[in-house]
Amino acid sequence: MSLRGAERRSNLKELSFLRRQESSLFFWIPTFVGKTKNAMPEPALSDKTRLPRSRWSLAMTRAKGLAMTVLFLFFPTITFPFMPDTEIASFQKEIAGKPVGERIALWAEKFVGTPYDPDPLGEYVTKKVIVADERADCMYLSFRAVELAMSLTPEEAVNIALDKRFINRGKLGNNGKVLNYEDRFQYGEDMLDSGRWGREITEELGKVTEITGSRGRGKVKMVSKEDLLKSLRSSKSSSSLNLRDGDFIFFIKAVEKRKVGEIVGHIGIVKIEQRAESREQRAIYLIHAGGVKNKGGEVKKVRFSEYINSMPFIGIR
């Protein structure tokens, strides 16, 4: 799927939305260490019995290390913000003149290295928030990259999220919490078929195969893994594929592996890196949240051809 030709909505109303507050634990860490230091002053001993300065420093260093070890044993999920709103706004302004697809790819790349969201529902859904950038699954990465790319401010990105993440439209309570996440897009195929996330380009990528659908879909079109690999081998490069920056790749699960009728098993975002003016000198990458629910992983940037070769899916849309 591609958002080629999509333009930023100019009539979006400004929305006053307070981004989630930082966790108190985030600010508590230095306080904890400081109290440890103050609670262990250098003992007032006589000159004959006073510890040498180097030994006292070593003892204090070990005490601090022990304190931090205990802290992280009890609070192993402490995380740091992805980007503060000031940096988000600055980057939005910096890339505002680029095509929307390129902006999507650049924002997706910003998430590379972000821990995978192991929450089965998605942490953003469980917490009923729009912004939860500390962790990402493939759906959240797709949502957020588009929202940030199509907006000029963090607040505007939230407004776009209310329009795009939901089958109808998202609603926020007075406390900034989402009231109707049950109305969100939960299936990749629903996103694709809605037409609200761009134009489908499946038939432009290669030979189309039909497989059994589900949830009201009789048949579903895709380019099979085998045909895609043949195209990659025959051209000796993925550069011949009609892919552009910001294109979404929806990976199709085998019918027998579906658990709740899902057709799409994963989503990734294309990023093109041009080595020269020649089309043959461009490299195609896939940015995706690689992980397993209840286990972990991270957002990765990998060669498109390498991912296709090793992926557990039967095709793409």
Go through each PLM region and give its residues.
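A mature extracytoplasmic/lumenal domain signature
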Residues: K253-V255, H288-G291
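A mid-sequence, solvent-exposed acidic-amphipathic segment
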Residues: T209-R258
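Catalytic nucleophile-His microenvironment captured as a short glycine-rich beta-strand/loop
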Residues: F248, G261-Q274, R282-H288
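C-terminal regions of proteins
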Residues: G290-R317
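A cross-taxon signal for low-complexity, glycine/charged-rich
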Residues: R8-E14, R20-L25, G34-K37, P41, ...
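N-terminal capping segments
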Residues: F80-G218, K259-V260
